[in-house]
Amino acid sequence: MVCIKLNKLLFFIYLIFISCKTLNPGRGQVDFVKDPNFNIIPNNDIGLSSFNKKVVVFGIDLYAVKEVEDRKLLHAANVMAQYLDNDEDGFIDNQLVLDKMLENKAFLVMWKKEKNLNIKIPSERIGQDLGNDETNPSFVSNGNTGRFDATLEEVLHLINNAGHSYAYPGAFGKNQKSELSKAMDVARGGRFFKIPSVYPVDAWFSYYDSTCHYETCQTIEYLYWALTSILGAQENRLNEIGKEWKLNTADLVENTDNKIFKLLTNPIYNFPTILPDGSYKH
């Protein structure tokens, strides 16, 4: 899903190598897993203290409850880093996008049970959620096969929602006039502010979630499908995703949805060209 859910109701809120020392498990204490780039540290941030540990990636907070596996939290951190520094040269590919994420105090929360999301988030922050059990660090390394890694989706949603939509409102803004929305209208077979009972037969993006609103959700979902298809993440998933998204390869996106393809490959925006695998600078 596109955003953090409280009791599964959609909302968007406007809302580093460490020692091998292991703390005793418990609230506010963390079992550390070694990573060459990122540290897991205890967390007590206001409004998010129920998530007892976190990793900071280029200033972006990634939180997790204690039941979330450390390796999966670190995987999410590495995917975040690879999306933002796709060539892994140590420099952010699009500083404006990161600046907007920082302005919006963007954050990711990782949960084990849905009840972990029954929290009151600081209103000035924009957040995203990711489940422990939907995180599969081996998906990309196994040739984009097996159970899909939701990290590729949820981390990208956060970057697009808190970053691109603010950095480039004319292109990626969550509004009816943005280039993203115009391309999406073609992909859906029309401009539907309410979910249609049946999408037109010529639509290639058909998202039926009634909680997913046109501007704040449908646009972000559409961007995710298009970019990850260009990057190769969906190439083996057509049978799984075809009812929602039909253009599961880069060639299909380029040849069928040239509007979004040109937008996402425009060098001005410097979108990723390599699918993250969770091994940033390893």
Predicted regions and their residues:
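Conserved aromatic-histidine-acidic binding/catalytic patches
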Residues: 64-71, 143-147, 208-220, 244-252
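Sec-dependent signal peptide recognition
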Residues: 5-14
